Amino acid sequence: MADSLDEFIEEQKAKLAKDKAELESDPPYMEMKGKASEKLSENSKILISMAKENIPPSSQQQPKGPLGIEYGLSLPLGEDYEQKKHKLKEELRQDYRRYLTQGITQAKRKKNFLSTGETDPSTLGVSLPIDERLSAKERLKLERNREYNQFLRGKAESTEKVRQVEKNIEPKSQRNKNPISQGKSDLPLQIQTAYTHSEGPWLSRQEEGLYRQLDGEIELRSRRPLKQTKEEVGISGAEHPSLSGSAGVPERRARRANGERVLDRQHCRADRDPGVSEDMDERFRFESDFDRRLLRVYTNGRPHGSRRGYVDGDDVPEEPNTQISAAENKSVHCNGPPRSADLDITSPFAGMLFGGEDRELTKRRKEKYRQELLEQIAEQQKKKRREKDLAFGITTSGVQDPEKSPDRLKQFSLTPRHFEEMPPERPRVAFQTPPPPFSAPSSPSVPPVHSAPSHNEDLHSGLGSTLGELAHPRVLPVPLNPPPPPLLAPPASNYRTPYDDAYYFYGARNTLDPNIVYYGSGMIGGQPAPHVSAPVTHQVAPPAVNTVGQNEQKVLSDGLRNSGLVFEDKPKPSTQSLQSYQEALQEQIREREARRKKERLEKEEYEAKLEAEMRIYNPWGKGGGGAPLRDAKGNLITDLNRMHRQNIDAYHNPDARTYEDKRAVVSIDQNLATSNAENLEDSANKNSGPLQTQSSPFARGNTFGEPLSELQIKQQELYKNFLRFQIEEKRQREEAEREKLRVAEEKEEKRLAEQRARIQQEYEEEQERRREKEEEQRLKNEELIRLAEERRKEAERKKKEEEEKHNLQLQHYYERENIIGDETKHLRQPSPVVPALQNKIASKLQRPPSVDTIISSFIHESSMSRAQSPPVPARKNQLRAEEEKKNVIMELSEMRKQLRSEERRLQGRLLHLDSDDEIPMRKRERNPMDIFDMARHRVQAPVRRPSPKGLDATTFQNIHDFNELRERDSDTRVDLRLMYPDPPRDHHTLEIQQQALLREQQKRLNRIKMRRDAGADLDTICTDNAQGRRMPRDDTNDFLKNSLLESDSAFIGAYGETYPVIEDNAFPPPSQLPSARERRRNKLKGLDFDSSRLHTPQDGLSLKSISSVNVDQVRMRNEDRMRRLTEQQKKPTNTDDEGSLVDPDDIMRHLSDDGRNSAATEPWLRPGTSESLKRFMAEHLNEEQHKGPGKPGTFTWQGLSAAHA
């Protein structure tokens, strides 16, 4: 960062020198108009040159007085415009003060940042401060306005101070009053006035530029120790003895000029590096080639030569090999002026230095210069950025460079603007007058012949090398000794114009005109025109001249006389003073010639170095914005993270940032300060001899290997200390980062440990809950197993009780049979039966009869018995005994089936006790046969048993009750189990099996009613058949009337036929029965009453109806059936007497709301009906046992079950 700041300040220093040169060459007032003269085309320039021939040029020889004083081109203004001019100056002064007030505030802030090492907040994040971007025109306007305002202010202040001092020193100047008055009396009044007014612009501007430079140099010189001798400090008085005794010059002004002279000599002894002086601080010594070469464009028009007013006789043309810089020109002008006697013709006052500088005034000027320097810093950065954006090339190869276009400088205000016009010219007469004779005795001699080549050499060096290098290629060196143009007579004194001297001074010439040498001498203050337009570039300050001993009053008087400030009461300068100037000038020329020989060699080395640098020149400049990023060695930078860290470090430590300027052709040599340090020592010992030379201004680096200066060593130590500080800071930062990472890792480990502990705890709690759940499930399973075991034991106990009860009943039955058998022994034997009937009876004894067989045998026997005569009572008893034997065998067979069925049911319940399904699902192959055909053929049909999980509680309970009902042993239930071996699993299968059971029971009821209505002669057979089918043997008609099975609803047969309600009058009385022939015919036709069919839809259509699968309707029906059956069970029924058996029709009417109930609503179809009847018959059986085991006509459990079936 220190190197960056050094180079930045050095660039600003060079910029300041360039601005002062521009101020001297181009008037700010005209720059506000647009510098039209510099931007005109070639044709316009030619027209201007032709028009200027008619103007009385100041370059022509003007009439001289007896003292040889020349008068410039400037014409006097009219008396009428003096007030207006002063008013304009006052307004400009006020504007400048307002502008300066604002600039000082900003400059102080910037100075504070520079002095304290802080960074301007507006420039954070960038290498150099970047202010607002203004166009070139706006920047030039602002700059010219500021410079011109300063010029006017300085001019007014200088004039006022001179007048004040004049009053104080008027007695001392009386001795020189007469010669001056005599010299001036020979001149016309208007010339005297013009001469007086012509001093203002350039003299005031000279003083303003010098004290600005003085401020900056004194400020920089105060920062480091310098070896300054008395000889250097008092060089002004030694070199200008003729002015020491001059009268009418302000004392303060003399001290200021003296201080400026001291600084100028020190500055001119620098290493001739453009913009770099010996008194400059080390940080200002690094300047890019951009600034160095760009300054040359604006330094050719400086009027230093005209102000210093001398011509070197030893200044031989060097062709374009010599490169000129603005700072060198400044140093030449500062040191070279009073050396020869020919200065009386050119400008005797040029180069004069006055007495010592007031310290207080120096401090104020230093502060002012610092403020102006800060203002120039931002402007310089803008220009450099613009140069970079426009790819402005480095001007090192001259006019023959094929890579550079001739008009590349036009974009920097060197081309004419369409909205700007040529400046108006000063009014002049239309004819020329001959110059006045040079016959004055006090006129100085004509300069020697060698002085002209010296001037032409300087002019050629300024135009040929600098202008030819940067401006148009057609600008060539001018002749060495051009003939002077004709002189113009001064205009009439009464011709007044509204323009002031500065306007005509800057508006009457083109500073870039290649023919500027033909302007002649005497442009301003009697100086030759070439020195006004092209500065003398290679003059250097000579060593102190000790031979001059005149007093300061005399030197001041000569300076005022030669500069154009002619006072009528001032004495003329002495000849000795002029001679001293000529001798000093000759000494300076000899010293410069020796120095130039050395500079040629250094220049050749420098050009070789530049050629090498051009080969590696990077046109992109600084990396970024599309250009690759490179480090100081030219390597590509691809680590953007490292660059980011570097930028952060530079932000926090801006002073320690290493400067890397990639915008220059090559990287800057950091050893350049060594050469400057050596030059500083040379400047301290400058007075050792005239042949002592300075280091080359083109040396870029430690060319001769000089050791480092104390300041450089101190800077290196500071840099090393800062590097150590950075290393330590980085180490501490890394340590803090590691500590931070360690703390973060500890926190993370702690968090993970807590998380692991929490997860472990949750896992253990989950395991504990799982174990508790498993234990609870195990206990529940044990409880279920225990309950199942209890149920199994209870079922076994009940089964044993039932078996015991059944055995007891059998025992009672056998005892009763034995009793009956014993009784029948005493009866007579019946008559032999028909063999056919005997065979049929025997066949019946062989196997248990089926339902159809029993019915058919019943009808056949009924018809057979009708043909016989009614038997006697003894015969009835015998037939009853035979029938009872048959019934015993059938009962035993049915009991065996019941036991097997109960055993299978219990085993199934035990196996599937813990499962969800009451009975396991058995997958069977799908039988293509119709389910009703299978039922008719007694073929077992596969039934899909859905899981009871999807059933509601009511349907599940109904299925359970129906399963208990279908497991009872009866003919209808046996046939149902044959047709549907699997119990129902849903409401659909439940409905189907209920319909099948209804059909079987309906057929059974039909048979019972047929036997009831058969007649009196069939009572015995009907009774025997009823007992064979487990029906009550006594009073069948009364039992059927009181039976719970009788209903008013229609019943569906096995084949889908429906039977109407059986009314009491459905069967005719015995007297109205058909004859035996009709009954035999009906028997042969198979038109049995139970098989009679009506033309009704099939069972499939009825079972597949919507009503058959209505779950809610089935549930409501089953609930209604269970409720009615419960009410019926609460009413005791006695089967012994006929009064206890009520009419079945009355029972059905009592159980139903009306006679319109369907078969599905009958109480006998309810799932609990069979169990209820079972309990009812058990109670009745107990009553029989109490009455007596042998009483005939009692009901048995099987008989009632068969009757219910």
Curated annotation (Swiss-Prot):
One of its GO terms (cellular component) is spindle pole. Residues 158-173, 222-233, 257-275, 401-410, 417-428, 1124-1134, 1146-1156 have a biased composition (Basic and acidic residues). Residues 16-37, 158-187, 222-277, 380-467, 677-704, 862-881, 1086-1105, 1124-1169, 1182-1205 are annotated as: Disordered. The modification Phosphoserine is found at S405, S850, S869, S915. Residues 12-34, 87-108, 357-391, 574-618, 724-813, 874-911, 993-1014 form a coiled coil. One of its GO terms (biological process) is positive regulation of cell division. Residues 176-187, 685-697 have a biased composition (Polar residues). Disulfide bonds: none annotated. It is found in: Cytoplasm, Cytoskeleton, Microtubule organizing center, Centrosome; Cytoplasm, Cytoskeleton, Spindle; Cytoplasm, Cytoskeleton, Spindle pole; Cell projection, Cilium. Pfam families: CSPP1_C. The keyword ATP-binding does not apply. Signal peptide: none annotated. Keywords: Cell projection, Coiled coil, Cytoplasm, Cytoskeleton, Microtubule, Phosphoprotein. Interacts with PLEKHG6. Interacts with ARMC9, TOGARAM1, CCDC66, CEP104 and CEP290. May play a role in cell-cycle-dependent microtubule organization. This is Centrosome and spindle pole associated protein 1. It comes from Mus musculus. The lineage of its organism: Eukaryota, Metazoa, Chordata, Craniata, Vertebrata. The gene is Cspp1.
